């Protein structure tokens, strides 16, 4: 049976966190989500990831969520625009290749680039991070208009606001941090998250 939405995400952080974020938007999360395990894999194997998702889950809409910092670091792209163009082109090729086949193809494929990394989206609800026991609220003194532009290194910013001896690489801690995010607030403080929020919200649930 077809589902209204499916996700392909870049790595473990997104795979573990996006269900929590989306469930706050829709009140539930029963959508398929694929961990592509690296930006290089998404760029090289977009068609394979799409084929798996379409073949097994038949989503009407697919959201591919990426960040460009790692792709830039690996020399795969020069900026987020190029990354989005490459992946969209791969998506178009997949649709063209499969259009005469037996698969029920999605109505829409959206590529959302987190600027600069997925952690930018976590930073976007800096106010609610103050209530998270992993963080030292006294260290979070800033007010932001657009964290995408105003926080150059989101991972370092988050690390600098933690309580002592907190390991952000621990899976349980990553989940706790993601659960803090309020989508409606984050959408006002991150332009890239606002795009994600819009695409997640704009689905046909009929």
Regions found by a protein language model. Name each.
Residues 2, 15-35, 47-57, 61, ...:
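C-terminal accessory helical subdomains adjacent to catalytic cores in phosphodiester-
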Residues 11-13:
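Short polar catalytic/cofactor-binding loops
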Residues 43-44:
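A conditional alpha-helix N-cap/helix-loop micro-motif detector
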Residues 37-39:
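Conserved helicase motor
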Residues 9, 66-68:
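Short glycine-centered, acidic/aromatic-flanked micro-motifs in structured strand/loop junctions
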Residues 4-8:
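Conserved beta-strand elements of the Class I
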């Amino acid at each position: 049976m077809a589902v209204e939405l499916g996700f392909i995400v870049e790595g473990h952080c997104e795979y573990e966190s996006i269900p929590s974020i989306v469930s706050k938007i829709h009140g539930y999360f029963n959508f398929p989500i694929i961990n592509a395990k690296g930006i290089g894999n998404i760029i090289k194997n977009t068609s394979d990831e799409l084929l798996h998702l379409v073949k097994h889950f038949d989503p009407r809409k697919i959201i591919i969520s990426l960040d460009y910092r790692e792709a830039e670091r690996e020399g795969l792209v020069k900026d987020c625009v190029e990354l989005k163009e490459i992946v969209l082109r791969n998506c178009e090729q997949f649709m063209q290749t499969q259009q005469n086949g037996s698969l029920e193809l999605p109505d829409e494929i959206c590529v959302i680039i987190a600027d600069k990394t997925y952690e930018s989206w976590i930073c976007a609800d800096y106010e609610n991070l103050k209530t998270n026991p992993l963080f030292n609220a006294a260290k979070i003194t800033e007010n932001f208009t657009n964290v995408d532009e105003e926080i150059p290194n989101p991972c370092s910013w988050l690390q600098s606001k933690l309580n002592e001896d907190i390991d952000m690489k621990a899976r349980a801690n990553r989940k706790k941090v993601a659960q803090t995010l309020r989508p409606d607030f984050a959408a006002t403080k991150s332009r890239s998250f606002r795009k994600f929020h819009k695409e997640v919200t704009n689905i046909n649930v009929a």
